[in-house]
């Protein structure tokens, strides 16, 4: 886990352009940016480097620093958490569903690297290989349609292994404070009473649910 003060330092380096290219900075200057001593700034850099969140090349009068992919992913997770936090100011829809078995295809699709990278970038987590499948009652279809009218995140398709994998839509959501995402294949005629949910953990185990148990999915809106 990244400490708050180290995350502050990482954010400052990213704002200087460290995610695009190496930035040259001394511990003295970084300390001034962070309103702390050069020694403390140096310790934070060592901590970030130790966690592989930055890479750096030392020079006599400073250092070239680059925010690594791991560092960028850490910032994206932080951003996603703030988005979920403040999105609740608008309100939320609650979508109750009954746990059902799927076809097992979710495990395969969630293991594909191009999908995993996009979910990490947009949702702030790498999905557990598999989906939680829920069936809605007829009375909850209107709520599902309201959620469908919100702005969804497109997950782009790609070609691999001699196959073409289509676009997927996803919607950030939560189940019992676990960050999740509703996923809908791009193909038309997807059943409106079925909801597939991804998460960073296996939801059946994390929630302690089994077939025919009831689960509430919460979707925030502005």
UniProtKB/Swiss-Prot annotation:
Gene source species: Methanoregula boonei (strain DSM 21154 / JCM 14090 / 6A8)
HAMAP family the UniProt entry points to: Riboflavin_kinase (MF_01285)
Function: Catalyzes the CTP-dependent phosphorylation of riboflavin (vitamin B2) to form flavin mononucleotide (FMN).
Similarity comment text for this entry: Belongs to the archaeal riboflavin kinase family.
Protein name: Riboflavin kinase
Cofactor(s) essential for the protein: Mg(2+)
Gene (UniProt): ribK
Record GO terms (molecular function): magnesium ion binding; nucleotide binding; riboflavin kinase activity
Xref: PANTHER family: RIBOFLAVIN KINASE
């Amino acid at each position: 886990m990244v400490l708050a003060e180290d995350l502050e330092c990482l954010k400052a380096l990213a704002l200087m352009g460290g995610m695009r290219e190496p930035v040259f900075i001394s511990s003295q200057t970084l300390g001034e940016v962070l309103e702390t001593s050069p020694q403390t700034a140096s310790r934070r850099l060592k901590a970030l480097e130790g966690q592989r969140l930055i890479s750096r090349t030392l020079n006599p009068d400073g250092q070239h620093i680059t925010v690594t992919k791991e560092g960028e992913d850490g910032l994206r997770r932080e951003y996603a958490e703030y988005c979920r936090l403040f999105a609740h100011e608008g309100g939320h829809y609650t979508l109750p569903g009954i746990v059902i078995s799927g076809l097992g295809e979710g495990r395969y699709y969630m293991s594909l690297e191009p999908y995993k990278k996009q979910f990490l970038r947009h949702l702030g987590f790498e999905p557990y290989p598999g989906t939680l499948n829920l069936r809605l009652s007829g009375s909850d279809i209107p709520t599902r349609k309201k959620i469908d009218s919100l702005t969804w995140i497109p997950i782009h398709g790609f070609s691999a292994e001699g196959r073409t994998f289509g676009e997927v839509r996803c919607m950030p959501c939560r189940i019992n404070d676990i960050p999740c995402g509703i996923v809908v294949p791009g193909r038309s005629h997807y059943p409106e009473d079925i909801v597939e949910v991804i998460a960073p953990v296996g939801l059946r185990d994390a929630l302690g649910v089994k077939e025919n148990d009831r689960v509430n999915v919460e979707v925030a809106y502005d």
